[in-house]
From Swiss-Prot:
PANTHER family: ATP-DEPENDENT DETHIOBIOTIN SYNTHETASE BIOD 2, DETHIOBIOTIN SYNTHETASE. GO terms for cellular component: cytosol. Keywords: ATP-binding, Biotin biosynthesis, Cytoplasm, Ligase, Magnesium, Metal-binding, Nucleotide-binding. Pfam families: AAA_26. InterPro entries: DTB_synth_BioD, P-loop_NTPase. Catalyzes a mechanistically unusual reaction, the ATP-dependent insertion of CO2 between the N7 and N8 nitrogen atoms of 7,8-diaminopelargonic acid (DAPA, also called 7,8-diammoniononanoate) to form a ureido ring. Belongs to the dethiobiotin synthetase family. This is ATP-dependent dethiobiotin synthetase BioD. Its EC number is 6.3.3.3. Its main location: cytoplasm. It comes from Sphingopyxis alaskensis (strain DSM 13593 / LMG 18877 / RB2256) (Sphingomonas alaskensis). It comes from the Bacteria. It catalyses: (7R,8S)-7,8-diammoniononanoate + CO2 + ATP = (4R,5S)-dethiobiotin + ADP + phosphate + 3 H(+).
Amino acid sequence: MTRFVVTGTDTGIGKTIFSASLARATGTPYWKPVQSGLEEETDSEIVARLAGVPVRPEAYRLVTPASPHIAAEIDGVAIDIERLTPPPGELIVEGAGGALVPVTRRTLYAELFARWQVPVIVCARTSLGTINHSLLTIEALKRRDVPIHGVVFIGDAVEDSEAIIADVSGVRRLGRLPVVAPLTSENLAAAFGANFDIADFR
């Protein structure tokens, strides 16, 4: 069954694009529990456009483009973490920013992942600094007993960095999604098919 949480080592690294590629390849519904910032195309809208799969409505749509805990406070919204529990069945759940981003003043995303016990896919850059960021993220998840399905790299190939992260962490490499340009549904599907084994996500 395709049921994963997609998190990352930082914000803006390509989690949504990878989520869209995985959702399209597997035909799996997508859910972003908390969306912060509504002025531009939202992550759910991007996935709907690129993947063509069912997209569940966000539990919280926050106007302010910031970390959920701050955005909620500015918007006057109290986030109830019980509303963020993923529903049963096949689903791709995307977090916000990195794994240690606060959802509320008391709860980090990694702590939600530990509660959910849904296997996590860690998205990481291939650019300079990714070794430290990736190993810290994986270590933080492991310390909280979060099940880690594997790591996905996004960007140009940097073989040594990708290999050392997998070797040191003991987490398997699932593949690398290159920069897709122009970013169309067809091009994204081709990139996923050329760089990942769909059996790793079933």
